[in-house]
Amino acid sequence: MTIAVGRAPQRGWFDVLDDWLKRDRFVFVGWSGILLLPTAYLAIGGWLTGTTFVTSWYTHGIASSYLEGCNFLTAAVSTPADAMGHSLLLLWGPEAQGDFVRWCQLGGLWAFVALHGAFALIGFMLRQFEIARLVGIRPYNAIAFSGPIAVFVSVFLMYPLGQSSWFFAPSFGVAAIFRFLLFLQGFHNWTLNPFHMMGVAGILGGALLCAIHGATVENTLFEDGEQANTFKAFEPTQEEETYSMVTANRFWSQIFGIAFSNKRWLHFFMLFVPVMGLWTSSIGIIGLALNLRAYDFVSQEIRAAEDPEFETFYTKNILLNEGLRAWMAPADQPHENFVFPEEVLPRGNAL
């Protein structure tokens, strides 16, 4: 009797690599990790290096590092000089010509952090897609994370691409972001933009929904433990519900006259509201990149100019924006050598 034993199929390098990447370990790597881990490491490392050592004297005329006396709130990795335009500012490019110190002085670290940070965020979203597929769940976490990605890409990349250079993007720092917000208000009247309004409604609405949902669940927990602390009565693998949806529905029906009766609709709504807020604000930022105007109530401006007794909150805000532009531009863009004659500077209600 003859027994034929077949040869084991040869495993290619791709299969071996796939198995290694998806191996069960403390920190999952996966195919997405090939993009996420190095880019996140370089982006964070670049930011720490810039805020610790690199000055902004040559790009913004200011100090921006711990080495120069800044603290955590005032240190930043500043945007490149306006003269750099939209150059990628590669270390080996024509601007720095391989000189690392010159590259830092020109703002090369900002481009480095921005581009690697964008790819790191995309890698993190792909990581959520990959793990969701392996675990066998739906990919709504990854879809939700597209909101922060849209905001980052629109604010840090799309907006300056629509302007004259990377210089007009936000620098990577706390006070630097605040300066950028003031800039958006003064030069674009951003708070009156309907996309900003939708973004605020989405983010604050999401926070409100989160608070309401958490409080309602805590209010309607089943009394299933003898201890004062109800947290210890919960087991992650328990089959029964931990709170009463029926009681929660009756509670909110009495308060508003209407309430969610479907947990799936409720949680989808909690996903939808903040993510739509992030998406709409990102669309608005792209509009600002193209210098699109939102609401201009010209009739009120004309009447306010003609009638000293007529004033609205809109006309007051327009005057504030003029003040921001007039006083901010010379300090924010010293390389332009702006000089505004005193007679054109705004004087409050006196117009």
UniProtKB/Swiss-Prot annotation:
The D1/D2 heterodimer binds P680, chlorophylls that are the primary electron donor of PSII, and subsequent electron acceptors. It shares a non-heme iron and each subunit binds pheophytin, quinone, additional chlorophylls, carotenoids and lipids. There is also a Cl(-1) ion associated with D1 and D2, which is required for oxygen evolution. The PSII complex binds additional chlorophylls, carotenoids and specific lipids. It catalyses: 2 a plastoquinone + 4 hnu + 2 H2O = 2 a plastoquinol + O2. Chlorophyll a ChlzD2 binds at H116. SUPFAM superfamilies: Bacterial photosystem II reaction centre, L and M subunits (SSF81483). It is a multi-pass membrane protein. One of its GO terms (molecular function) is oxygen evolving activity. Disulfide bonds: none annotated. Keywords: Chlorophyll, Chromophore, Electron transport, Iron, Magnesium, Membrane, Metal-binding, Oxidoreductase, Photosynthesis, Photosystem II, Thylakoid, Transmembrane, Transmembrane helix, Transport. Its EC number is 1.10.3.9. It holds the Pfam family Photo_RC. GO terms for biological process: photosynthetic electron transport in photosystem II. Pheophytin a binds at Q128, N141. Its main location: membrane. InterPro entries: D1/D2, Photo_II_D1/D2_sf, Photo_RC_L/M, Photo_RC_L/M_CS, PSII_PsbD/D2. The chain crosses the membrane at residues 39-59, 123-139, 151-164, 206-226, 277-293. A plastoquinone binds at H213, F260. It is found in: Cellular thylakoid membrane. PANTHER family: PHOTOSYSTEM II D2 PROTEIN, PHOTOSYSTEM II PROTEIN D1. Belongs to the reaction center PufL/M/PsbA/D family. Photosystem II (PSII) is a light-driven water:plastoquinone oxidoreductase that uses light energy to abstract electrons from H(2)O, generating O(2) and a proton gradient subsequently used for ATP formation. It consists of a core antenna complex that captures photons, and an electron transfer chain that converts photonic excitation into a charge separation. The D1/D2 (PsbA/PsbD) reaction center heterodimer binds P680, the primary electron donor of PSII as well as several subsequent electron acceptors. D2 is needed for assembly of a stable PSII complex. PSII is composed of 1 copy each of membrane proteins PsbA, PsbB, PsbC, PsbD, PsbE, PsbF, PsbH, PsbI, PsbJ, PsbK, PsbL, PsbM, PsbT, PsbX, PsbY, PsbZ, Psb30/Ycf12, peripheral proteins PsbO, CyanoQ (PsbQ), PsbU, PsbV and a large number of cofactors. It forms dimeric complexes. 2 of the reaction center chlorophylls (ChlD1 and ChlD2) are entirely coordinated by water. This is Photosystem II D2 protein. It comes from Synechococcus sp. (strain CC9605).
